[in-house]
């Protein structure tokens, strides 16, 4: 996230904590331009619910050459950080539930978190109706049966991502086919 999304992130966190009071969370926040005040706000919020916030500051060169496309001018380059979770998070974390910082959680997320991943890359919400009519699979050149998905909620198998170099695959695809990327990180994933 960046400073502009701290307020939204706080709402997401409160909805997560309030609707999952029996769970203990470590929230991993990836941010480049958060002030100490911003961090203190989110850390205090997590602490109020007996949870923990950890912060990761990616290298600025990680997104060198990346741009925000289409009509998504409300997004920042920070949107691409989810592609690099396997590189940014500590090696001892083998799975992560990625949540966009502008969503509201209305119930128990435990069933989603406990979804077996086995050898799968992860779990995502398919049939993104906002992009359905665009036939993204044709433009991105992947089989239609693989389904385009919304990248706002992702349960990610970090072991698989690390073993299969998913972060590097995203970079390689972006640099090889930049003209195909319209929906930013979502197209890469």
Q: Where are the language model's segments positioned?
A:
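Histidine-anchored nucleotide/phosphate-binding helix
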Residues: 6-20
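Short internal beta-strands
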Residues: 25-33, 123-126
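Active-site-proximal specificity loops/subdomain of glycosyltransferases
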Residues: 37-88
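Short aromatic/hydrophobic "clamp" motif used to bind/position activated sugar donors
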Residues: 96
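Catalytic metal- and UDP-sugar-binding loop of GT-A-like glycosyltransferases, i.e.
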Residues: 99
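Conserved donor-nucleotide/metal-binding helix-loop-beta segment in metal-dependent transferases, i.e.
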Residues: 103-139
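Catalytic core and acceptor-binding pocket of nucleotide-sugar-dependent glycosyltransferases
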Residues: 124-131, 146-189
